[in-house]
């Protein structure tokens, strides 16, 4: 997917377990973070990894930035005041996590 879409930025979950914020340590979130970071580096920029992708026209690609959500040491904060209602509307669609 990275070689096909060639993103400049990828946003993912942290692969690190957080004991102070247990929701951030859900096994699925940790697995997604690890899989994403492994896909970004070194695989997406290594032309020798998955050589069949070269045959399909998907050249190696270096992602310029990776933002990691729920990390222990956040360094970027986004003001969502203007989209707060949309944020909660989207969150409530995640019915496996929020049932009421």
Regions found by a protein language model. Name each.
Residues 1-100:
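Metal-dependent de-N-acetylase/amidase catalytic core
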């Amino acid at each position: 997917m990275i070689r096909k879409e060639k993103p400049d930025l990828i946003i993912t979950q942290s692969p690190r377990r957080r004991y102070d914020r247990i929701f951030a340590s859900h096994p699925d979130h940790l697995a997604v973070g690890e899989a994403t970071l492994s896909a970004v580096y070194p695989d997406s920029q290594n032309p020798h990894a998955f050589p069949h992708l070269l045959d399909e026209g998907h050249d190696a690609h270096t992602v310029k930035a990776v933002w990691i959500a729920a990390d222990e040491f956040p360094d970027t904060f986004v003001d969502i005041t203007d989209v707060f209602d949309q944020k909660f509307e989207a969150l409530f669609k995640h019915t496996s996590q929020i049932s009421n």
